[in-house]
């Protein structure tokens, strides 16, 4: 009799859970039907008015105003940078709803120095001065406008659905993601003293490789760490007709660039992904002058910190060893400078939390619309919110943004769809935003349910 009773209770529990999920999904769909037109309008306004990293003043103020209107306690101007002229434009909105977990949801705010070529009626025409005083075009070419809109849509739904969750909800508008120092700036300015330390931190990122209306998940390492390295190769200059009297830094730089390619192929294990890219090389002023200096700019990427450290040590060894072999005196050895600002940690998705959210998403949009996504060597500073050693479980999931017809044509003709950072990157607004808001809201409800 007791076993029979147990089975009946279990069946009732399952039915109640399924019914509750169905009702919750219907509720989200109904609320989104009401809100979607306004959210798309918000997205188009944001897209047309992008701001560069460290200068997100209007975007930040807009997010703060919207969160206050929804009843969140808002703190503005959060962020402490290495350069005093950069102001902190971080925004934090907090909504307390009784005892329970603290969940942090983050969106980035900044745009890129890219001239938009989408031809859309709401395309950015913004031009501004960058940090170097150069006139540049600005575009939301990485979809942060989608992220902001999804955050605001989620903020509204969760404020209305307070009877379905408990705890403290923290919504973060983070500046300077593209510069990779915005998350650090907010943490250095006391973010985790301002709010309860999160039990979970989650974020989404749109991607052109997936159809709008679909989602992607990556357990474990999802994005790489990144470090900028500057190498100044010095030499002894002279006349181009008398190279024997010089130590040509252009030849040295060429040898160094080629030698750097062996770090990944010959010094690292094949199961440790890494990238060493020389993205910039500048030296000399005219054809008949052998210069005395060449400047290289590198990006170094890996998943593991120990791999990163090994690469950095190898760069210095190769640069200085090449100069020594060429007969340069010690006082003219290359100068290797590892940036302490243009550096960010890897994004590590907590496997258990990723699996939990994947199950939520599969029930929400269907098993056939949630895809595994392989780790990539691009970088994000969202992982910093998990603190060193991944103390706080974090997940960044992928939000499909492309027109299905465009993706289908891409598969047929082999021509890739416009990627993130492309001047042609153009998410399909309505289904992308709808899915982003729905998925993020469902994720928070699952983590904070009563």
Predicted regions and their residues:
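Positively charged n-region of N-terminal signal peptides that target proteins for export
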Residues: 1-8
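Bacterial N-terminal signal peptides
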Residues: 8-20
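Acidic/His- and Gly-rich active-site-bordering loop/insert found
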Residues: 25-140, 149-153, 157-166
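Soluble non-cytosolic domains of exported or imported proteins
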Residues: 33-37, 50-61, 141, 145, ...
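Divalent metal-coordination and catalytic microenvironments
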Residues: 46, 93, 105, 144, ...
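Histidine/acidic-residue-rich, glycine-tolerant segments that coordinate divalent metal ions
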Residues: 90, 127-139, 145-146, 157-280, ...
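Metal-dependent amide/peptide-bond hydrolase catalytic core
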Residues: 251-450
